[in-house]
């Protein structure tokens, strides 16, 4: 665990041994996360290393063996081969990912099974399979 910030008893930041490849950002306290299974989430390197916004996010049943929120965040341009390589995605504290892309915050308490796509620079919608994902890089 690479602790970027400690909030009370909760460590916030990277759950990964190598942080040098990740885009460095200032971590602020943006959310309070009190859900029982923890605050971990799986995030594509396209977001944390390449600078893309979250384009596709879904919440699956959390892994009860780990501090897992169930959230999975992708840029939206990852293919099966990219995702099959475990070196291309990492576990982060959910507050950290909110700092990479604040647009996800209103959706975080959605129920398990929820799936959203970015439909333009600032908006997400429930994914019903009829719209394309808006894939874009963050402005620095």
List each model region and its residues.
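Short acidic, Pro/Gly- and aromatic-enriched capping/linker segments at domain boundaries
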Residues: 27-45
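Short, aromatic- and cysteine-enriched interfacial helices/patches
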Residues: 13-17
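Acidic, aromatic-enriched beta-alpha/helix-loop junctions
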Residues: 57-107
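Short, Lys/Arg-enriched N-terminal segments with co-localized hydrophobic residues
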Residues: 1-11
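Short, compact, well-ordered microdomains
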Residues: 91-137
